[in-house]
Amino acid sequence: MKRNNYFRDMGNKIAYFIMDYCIKNNIGTVVIGKNSNWKNESNIGKISNQKFCFIPHSTIFQKIKEKCESVGITYIEREESYTSKASFLDKDNIPIYEEGSFTKYNFSGKRVERGLYKTKKGILINADVNGASNILRKEFKDAFKDIKDFSYLYKTVRRITIT
């Protein structure tokens, strides 16, 4: 009961925060990255697996979808394979995962430590920013075509927290 109330409350807060941010910044589409078996195949340690798999992600995604659509914001769930491995700044090609395929892909950058991704040019970028940008790029190929300077992605110091 306590757990359900906590996640219902947190889901509502997250959904409201995203909806409010989109309205204030004139954003018309929200793209959420999703993998079908991400909980079943997670291998991040025994305790971390228990904590991660405990979160009702689909319920939270549903709340975000409902809030967005209630104010006319388009909600899209996008398959997100390889978005954390591909380099956004180097414009790596992002393949789609195929079950049973043994194809090896080479990406120009790599994750160097928790939360940091290093590009081919040696630029350090937040790993979540890299992955999220690639999810958007995977859904909308030309999402960033008019932007020439991406330095704001790795020079930003503003932190957003949900309370």
Residue ranges with predicted function:
Residues 1-163:
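Positively charged, helix-rich recognition surfaces that bind polyanionic ligands
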